[in-house]
């Protein structure tokens, strides 16, 4: 068996085109374009690249994008004051604060300061709570993007055993909620999990998000499984790889996401979808 590649680049581009068409329909009808405020604190090179890709995506689909770059010396209160201003700005439907934040800033306090109706990253406890109550609105971008991939490839989730490796607030925990909502029986593995191999060998759908290169041996993959690799790691030779041993896993899985070009592009596509949703649901005028 050689796994079918789940192409996140193609699906993300399709999603962007769909959003762009809806934005054009809005503006043709005399409504304003959705607005996204992107806040970057400091000079972290990786964060600058991520922010650049998000700003470019906004331009592609016809959004109004505003950039707010604060120096690494900015105080937590300065960032909170900026968020307060953006919460009151009627032209901004979404507020994105790029993570990680500089040391010393209270990430939880800052993310909770964002109006839940403008929380297009889907990190606010209100939005995570809505997902857990089966009434999602603004959903965490990476898990939402993964669900989109499964849907677009017509991969059955209902009744399947889904195993999530990693329990972060950004991916693992909301991913468990998304798969539960989709009808899967879920197992979430973390650093205290015993017999990780045993859990993985039972997975019809495996989602791995731990940030360790080739952490999951390909030989552990169940025959015919769907493998979603969220990790993106740079090796000493400069090449990128995921958290799953890709070449071996390909011989056992039915579907698999590559790294790069799998989950990553879907995170930005989901952010764009969330911003349009926030505009249509909460701030449309």
From Swiss-Prot:
Pathway: One-carbon metabolism; tetrahydrofolate interconversion
Alphabetical list of InterPro entries matching this protein: Aminoacid_DH-like_N_sf, NAD(P)-bd_dom_sf, THF_DH/CycHdrlase, THF_DH/CycHdrlase_cat_dom, THF_DH/CycHdrlase_CS, THF_DH/CycHdrlase_NAD-bd_dom
Family the UniProt entry places it in: Belongs to the tetrahydrofolate dehydrogenase/cyclohydrolase family.
Activity control mechanisms: The NAD(+)-dependent dehydrogenase is activated by inorganic phosphate.
CDD domains with a match to the protein in the record: NAD_bind_m-THF_DH_Cyclohyd
Stated role: Catalyzes the oxidation of 5,10-methylenetetrahydrofolate to 5,10-methenyltetrahydrofolate and then the hydrolysis of 5,10-methenyltetrahydrofolate to 10-formyltetrahydrofolate.
Keyword Glycoprotein: no
Quaternary structure (record): Homodimer.
SUPFAM superfamilies to which the protein is assigned, alphabetical: Aminoacid dehydrogenase-like, N-terminal domain, NAD(P)-binding Rossmann-fold domains
EC assignment: 1.5.1.5, 3.5.4.9
A GO term from the CC aspect: cytosol
List of residues binding NADP(+): 166-168, 232
GO molecular function: methenyltetrahydrofolate cyclohydrolase activity; methylenetetrahydrofolate dehydrogenase (NADP+) activity
Gene Ontology terms: biological process: L-histidine biosynthetic process; methionine biosynthetic process; purine nucleotide biosynthetic process; tetrahydrofolate interconversion
Reactions mediated catalytically: (6R)-5,10-methylene-5,6,7,8-tetrahydrofolate + NADP(+) = (6R)-5,10-methenyltetrahydrofolate + NADPH; (6R)-5,10-methenyltetrahydrofolate + H2O = (6R)-10-formyltetrahydrofolate + H(+)
HAMAP family (alphabetical): THF_DHG_CYH
Protein keywords: Amino-acid biosynthesis, Histidine biosynthesis, Hydrolase, Methionine biosynthesis, Multifunctional enzyme, NADP, One-carbon metabolism, Oxidoreductase, Purine biosynthesis
Highest taxon, organism lineage: Bacteria
Name this protein carries in UniProt: Bifunctional protein FolD
């Amino acid at each position: 068996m050689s796994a079918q590649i789940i192409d996140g680049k193609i699906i993300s581009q399709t999603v962007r085109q769909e959003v762009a068409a809806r934005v054009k329909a809005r503006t043709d009808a005399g409504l304003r374009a959705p607005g996204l405020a992107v806040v970057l604190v400091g000079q972290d090179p990786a964060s600058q690249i991520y922010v650049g890709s998000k700003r470019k995506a906004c331009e592609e689909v016809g959004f109004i994008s505003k950039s707010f770059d604060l120096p690494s010396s900015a105080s937590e209160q300065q960032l909170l004051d900026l968020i307060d201003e953006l919460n009151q700005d009627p032209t901004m439907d979404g507020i994105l604060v790029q993570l990680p934040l500089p040391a010393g800033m209270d990430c939880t306090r800052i993310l909770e300061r964002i109006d839940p109706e403008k929380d297009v990253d889907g990190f606010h406890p209100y939005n995570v709570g809505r997902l857990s109550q089966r009434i999602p609105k603004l959903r965490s971008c990476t898990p939402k993007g993964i669900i989109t991939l499964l849907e677009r490839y017509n991969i059955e989730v209902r009744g399947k055993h889904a195993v999530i490796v990693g329990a972060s607030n950004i991916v693992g925990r909301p991913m468990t909620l998304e798969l539960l909502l989709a009808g899967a029986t879920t197992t979430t593995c973390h650093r205290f999990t015993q017999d990780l191999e045993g859990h993985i060998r039972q997975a019809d759908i495996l989602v791995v998000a731990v940030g360790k290169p080739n952490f999951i041996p390909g030989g552990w993959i169940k025959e015919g499984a769907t493998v979603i690799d969220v990790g993106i790691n740079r090796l000493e030779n400069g090449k990128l790889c995921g958290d799953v041993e890709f070449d071996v896993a390909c011989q056992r899985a039915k579907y698999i996401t590559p790294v790069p070009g799998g989950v990553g592009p879907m995170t930005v596509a989901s952010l764009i979808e969330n911003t349009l949703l926030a505009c249509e649901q909460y701030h449309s005028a």
